[in-house]
Amino acid sequence: CCVNCGQGNELDGLDERAKLSGASKLYIEDIVDDFCDNYIMPCVQAGAVYEHKYLLGTSMARPAIAKKLVEIARKENAVAICHGATGKGNDQIRFELGIKALAPDIKIIAPWRMTDVWTMQSRDDELAFCQAHGINLPFDASHSYSRDRNLWHISHEGLELEDPSNEPNYDDLLVMSTTPEKAPDKAEYVTMTFEKGVPKSINGEEMKVSDIIRKLNELGGKHGIGIIDIVENRVVGMKSRGVYETPGGTILY
């Protein structure tokens, strides 16, 4: 099961890759509007920020995904849900707490923590598996950042970012944005209306929240807004460096 939170063309080709990976059925569930209205907006209304900079793009999406996973598991009469989060990050906790809160009877399978039976222990191992099984990917090892994307943001980890002394290679890294140095020198002005902290229109044009975020992503991205490079604390006690692009969200905040 794959949940569409606004990943765009990252969903292309999933049917073929799922079949080649051994899946008998694939669900791609669109929850973009639910994600925006019921997960992003409450955080915006609360002014929620982690460690003074991070606008919680991944954190907000995981409960929404967990809810949909449980719905599909119930529909299929499944006894277990398997997720691909590693044993070092926050996602394993986010997914498993969400799943167990909604379906305490469902077993959770976490292959990355099952080192005695799961042979793939790195991104390189995964790339080798895909190559061996004819699974085409839209990137190679030289561009295999660990990324998480949805309508609100995209996060980047890995490769040169593993060494805190390295500057990010923004020319290869950025997806939604350009750097401020390459942004237009001319300012662009936006007028917005809000109702109880929820955006309702841009420049007099009423839109649903998801379309407002898309529009602000476009505007903010081309003006170099919302790029952060931070070392943050994970729940498991590790520190992790990440570069985040949140152009529309930064404008809203």
Predicted feature locations:
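Nucleotide-activated chemistry modules centered on ATP-dependent adenylation/adenylyltransferase
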Residues: C1-Y253
